[in-house]
Amino acid sequence: MSYLKDRDRGLILHTDVGIGYETPWRQVEALLLTAASRTSGLGDKPAPFVNIKSLGDFAVVYELNAPGGDPLTLGRQYTALHQNVLDVFNEHGVQIMTPAYEGDPPEPKIVKREDWYLAPAESKNP
């Protein structure tokens, strides 16, 4: 996690995800932007954007950049953004590969929607 502050632009939140080469980059970009759009408390200028940060040995590293809101709630903004990234990727069956990749599992490593609130998690409106 890192952030950048520019007097004219405000706070920009950054987060990285590594996704396998079998997932189209256009899909990954759309998923990350969807996660940003679901995150309350973020600003809208500049519009969220995605960079392809690196082409690794086993995964492409994408960087989501989104305008932050109140600097005093930075931790909550990152938490909400990361929760939405996890949910959106799970909803679409896309496995996040980082921080380490050891091989292709027989089944994708995602959390199915019906398992999002297993005990002791409290049920919330999905």
Model-identified regions with their sequence ranges:
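Solvent-exposed, non-transmembrane regulatory segments of membrane-associated proteins
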Residues: 1-6, 11, 16-23, 33, ...
